[in-house]
Each structure stands twice: as C-alpha cells, then as structure tokens.
UniProtKB/Swiss-Prot annotation:
Pfam families cross-referenced by the UniProt entry: KH_2, MMR_HSR1
Gene Ontology CC annotations of this record: cytosol; plasma membrane
G4, as annotated region: 119-122
Region (G3) location: 57-60
Chain residue ranges for the region called G2: 36-40
Record protein name field: GTPase Era
Binding-site positions, GTP: 10-17, 57-61, 119-122
Name of the gene: era
Species this chain originates from: Thermosipho africanus (strain TCF52B)
A biological-process GO annotation: ribosomal small subunit assembly
Assigned keywords, A-Z: Cell inner membrane, Cell membrane, Cytoplasm, GTP-binding, Membrane, Nucleotide-binding, Ribosome biogenesis, RNA-binding, rRNA-binding
C-alpha cells in the first residue's frame, strides 16, 4: 500500500477545500466563494485498497490584518513541514502575481516535492492557462508535475489523484479505512454552522464570526442535542445574523441542522445563540483555545 501526507498550499479562495472534496467524492470540508473560509488545519483521509492519502487542508496563506490571521498563516506554513507532498494551488482567474509568489516562496523553502494545480480552468481561456502553467514551471522548485483542474466540474481530478499516488512511497495505513477525518464531531458541526453563515452574510460579517460548540448530548428520545454559541465582534453584526424577526438565524440553523443530520445519520436538535465578544480576533486565548488553533501550530 502507498501512503502519505499531502498538504495543500495557496492563497485564500483558490479552491483547496473544493479540490479535496472532489478527490474524495464527498463534501467533508466547508466551502464558500469568500476568502479565508478555512481557518483550521484539517486532515481528510482517503483510503482505497491500494493507497491511503491524508490531505492536510490549510488556511490560505495571506498578509494578515488580525491576530487570527497571523495564527492562520502560521498554521498553514506549519502544515508544509513534514509532509510527503504539497499541492500548490493557483486560481486560473487570478493568475500568478505577488500573493502567489509569496506562497511559492514558502513551498520552495520546505524543500518538499510539489504538484502545481491550476484550478478553475473553466473560467478562463486556454491561452491564460498556458501562461500560468509556464509561470508555475519556472517558479516552483521540486515540482513533479502541473495539473489543470476545475474542482466544481470534476475536470482533471482523476489525473491529479493519479499523479499524487505516483509520487507517494510504500508505507503504513495510518488510520482505519472507514475514518474520513481526524476532527471530532464538535469541530465538524461548528464548521458546518460557520459555512452557512458565510453563505448568507456579506462583507466583514462572516469573517467576524466564531462558532463554539458548548454541548453535544444524545437525549433519551435518540435526538442529538447540540448547543452552539455564535460569537461576533459587534452588536450590529449580531443583529445581521439574527435577522428581521429571527429569519436569518432560523435559515442558518435549518440548513446547518440538515447537513449535520446527514453527517451523523440521525435526528439533530440544533440550539444556536448569538453573542458579542468584542475584538475577539485579536485575543490570543480565544484564538488558541476556544476555536482550537493551538494544535494547528504544532509541527
């Protein structure tokens, strides 16, 4: 059996999580069209009879504005250490500019084999894709190949998976074959809730939100009770998330509940509360402990 750890590197919103979801054939990682959706380092495990790949999905590498952003970048860079392969993802719409070269520098410093991935090729013409291909070829050291993909359409995904497997060594099975992530249910539930907030709110609001699961308990009737606090920076943001007559929080709750029910295979009662925690994105205790980034910073 071939096995190994494969990290994804790229600036925010290039489609790293969508690529992993497309490869494993199911939605494990939350996605949205807004940058910096992924905050924590997440392992997604893809096992067949022939291989086990542990995808290490990371926050986008960017110039941070808050302490939260600093920790996100540290988590992403930390994930590049000690892996067997890196997928360096570029958005075909954006091309290769200063932010991409910022990512390339970190990847090159790792001295790890990498595969260049040009994602969202369905949104640009072939000439631009070829230009990006050449820029990646000339910029990425230890590059074993470049694959053109559209994660949303599934284009290039099989070719990418084949190239990943080709570049892994024979090794042990690290996780049980039925395990798809090393994150607990509390983390997955909080991510699903946060994804729905990203889908329904705009501008600064989604980036100002932290979701903390306070309680998970199976009730006597077999329903899984989940109580979650949604923290925001300001009262105005609280009002937006609650919505007129509570319509927004109701929509977020209904959509999140359905997805969590699909995840656990049973009924869920989702109890959401919105609270103001002023300037939480600059408070180390909250970032490291309550939203769980302390473990993400370990090498």
């Amino acid at each position: 059996m071939k096995s190994g750890f494969v990290a994804l590197a790229g600036k925010p919103n290039v489609g790293k999580s969508s690529i992993v979801n497309a490869i494993v054939g199911k939605k494990i990682l939350i996605v949205s069209d807004k940058p910096q959706t992924t905050r924590n380092r997440i392992n997604v495990i893809h096992t067949t009879d022939d291989f086990q790949i542990i995808f290490v999905d990371t926050p986008g590498i960017h110039k941070p504005l808050y302490r939260l952003g600093e920790y996100m970048v540290k988590a992403a860079v930390s994930a590049l250490k000690g892996v067997d392969l890196i997928l360096t993802v570029v958005d075909a719409k954006e091309g290769v500019g200063k932010p991409e070269r910022f990512v390339f520098d970190y990847v090159n410093q790792s001295k790890t084999k990498t595969i260049g991935v040009i994602n969202k090729i369905d949104l640009v013409d072939a000439k631009k894709v070829e230009q990006i291909y050449n820029e990646i070829k000339n910029s990425l050291e230890n590059c074993v190949g470049i694959v053109k993909t559209s994660a949303v359409r599934g284009e290039g995904i099989k070719e990418l998976l084949d190239l990943i497997v080709e570049n892994l060594e024979e090794g042990p099975q690290y996780y049980p074959e039925d395990m798809i992530t090393d994150r607990p249910l509390s983390f997955m539930a909080s991510e699903i809730i946060r994804e729905k907030i990203f889908h329904h709110t705009y501008e600064e609001v989604p980036h100002s939100v932290a979701v903390i699961i306070e309680e998970i308990k199976e009730r006597d009737n077999g329903v899984l009770y989940i109580r979650a606090n949604i923290y925001v920076d300001r009262n105005s943001q609280k009002g937006i998330i609650i919505g007129q007559k509570g319509n927004m929080i109701k929509t977020i709750g209904q959509e999140a509940r359905k997805e969590i029910e699909y995840l656990v295979g049973g009924k869920v009662f989702l109890d959401l509360h919105v609270k103001v925690k002023k300037d939480w994105r600059n408070k180390d205790f909250i970032i490291l402990n309550e939203i769980g980034m302390r473990d993400d910073l370990k090498d």
